Design a protein with these regions (language model features):
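Conserved RNase H-like, two-metal-ion catalytic cores of nucleic-acid enzymes
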Residues: 55-143
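Short, amphipathic alpha-helical "recognition" segments used to contact nucleic acids or chromatin
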Residues: 3-19
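Residues immediately within or flanking Cys/His clusters that coordinate Zn2+
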Residues: 263-268, 292
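Short, cysteine/histidine-rich loop/knuckle motifs that typically chelate Zn2+
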Residues: 269-270, 297
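Metal-dependent phosphoesterase core characteristic of DEDDh/y 3'-5' exonuclease domains
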Residues: 35, 43-53, 62, 102-120, ...
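Short recognition patches in nucleic-acid-associated and regulatory proteins
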Residues: 272-293
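Short, charged amphipathic recognition helices of the HTH superfamily
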Residues: 16-29
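Short metal-binding segments enriched for Cys and/or His
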Residues: 292-317
Length: 321
């Protein structure tokens, strides 16, 4: 019997969580699918799924957080349809004369390789009152704990937006963290037809976005309970797709935050694996020479040794800019 899209999506969790084949089998059974454990194992093999952390101790990794937020649009008065310049005096106001601004509807997050998808969404009353302080405080706890935060367009949208709402709600900033913006990675490293997350995840055959339309956002702003539940589910799907996309893109990220420094061990700077092979090539700076390695964990070819292996001391450098 042909495997459905939902079944395949469940099986893919084997690749980027700590779930075993038996866990996938039980999840399929709980979802109403009649598959044997043997069939699940064959499916995993046929999809060529493997553990991206097979050569590392994930308990030693820094805290790496996948993050996605959903915000409301800004209600405005407009004289016509189409592209136009909307100024702040065109923003709608409530009965007390207060500007009706955008706010955060929900967030979803996932620690790298962890099975659990975390999320929070406004209640019906909070959505109507435009009160996002509670969900911001729950998100703040994760941001404060994270060493690295990964998001698609996160540097421009998610992280700046959430900090804007922190400021508006009198919430102090979390502890510093590094960021990986997968949109920037896509734009820098590839010439894809589209850099949208939905396009890239479809291209890579990983978790796709749920289908939605603008009315969902309107219903959420009006406090529709079912719409808010759907928004949270949409948000959670995005985070699952984000993690799978990041793992596929990771070997191409030449400027990945150095995990080896955070772990203080001789491991892959991109994924933390200690399974490194020398490739017999070198990376050269203005005055130094470093051995290059290939990582068997994340397949990254960008790993260089820490020690200068040059046999000569070079004191002359170019003064050109």
């Amino acid at each position: 019997m042909k495997w459905s899209a939902e079944e395949t999506s469940i099986v893919r969790q084997y690749e980027n969580t700590s779930k075993k084949a038996s866990d996938i089998y039980q999840q399929l059974f709980a979802s109403g699918y009649d598959r044997t454990l043997k069939a699940v194992r064959r499916k995993i093999e046929s999809m060529h799924l493997g553990k991206p952390y097979k050569n590392l101790d994930i308990s030693k990794l820094p805290k790496i957080l996948m993050l996605d937020i959903e915000t409301t649009p800004i209600p405005v008065w407009a004289w016509s349809l189409g592209k136009q310049y909307v100024q702040t005096h065109s923003m709608m106001k409530d009965s007390n004369g207060k500007i009706i601004d955008w706010y955060v509807l929900s967030w979803s997050a996932k620690w790298l390789y962890d099975d659990e998808v975390l999320s929070d969404v406004l209640t019906s009353k909070e959505a109507i009152d435009r009160n996002d302080k509670r969900v911001l405080e729950s998100a703040w706890k994760l941001l404060d704990e994270a060493d690295i935060i990964i998001a698609h367009n996160g540097d421009k949208f998610d992280l700046r937006k959430i900090k804007a709402r922190f400021l508006s709600n009198g919430i102090m900033p979390p502890m510093p963290y590094k960021t990986i913006d997968t949109l920037k990675v896509a734009r820098k490293e590839f010439a894809l037809t589209s850099n949208k997350q939905d396009y890239i995840t479809r291209l890579l055959g990983v978790q796709k976005k749920l289908d939605t339309d603008f009315q969902l956002w309107v219903d959420c702003m009006n406090g529709d309970t079912e719409a808010l539940k759907k928004m949270e589910e949409y948000n959670k799907h995005d985070v699952l797709g984000l993690e799978q996309m990041y793992l596929k893109l990771r070997p191409y990220i030449s400027g990945h935050p150095n995990i080896a420094v955070m772990m203080e061990e001789n491991v892959c700077s991109s994924c933390g694996s200690d399974s490194l092979n020398s490739v017999g090539k070198y990376y050269y700076t203005g005055s130094s020479k470093y051995e290059l390695y290939y990582c068997n964990g994340c397949m990254s070819p960008h790993i260089r040794g820490k020690n200068n292996v040059s046999e000569k001391n070079i004191f002359v450098r170019s003064a050109a800019k």
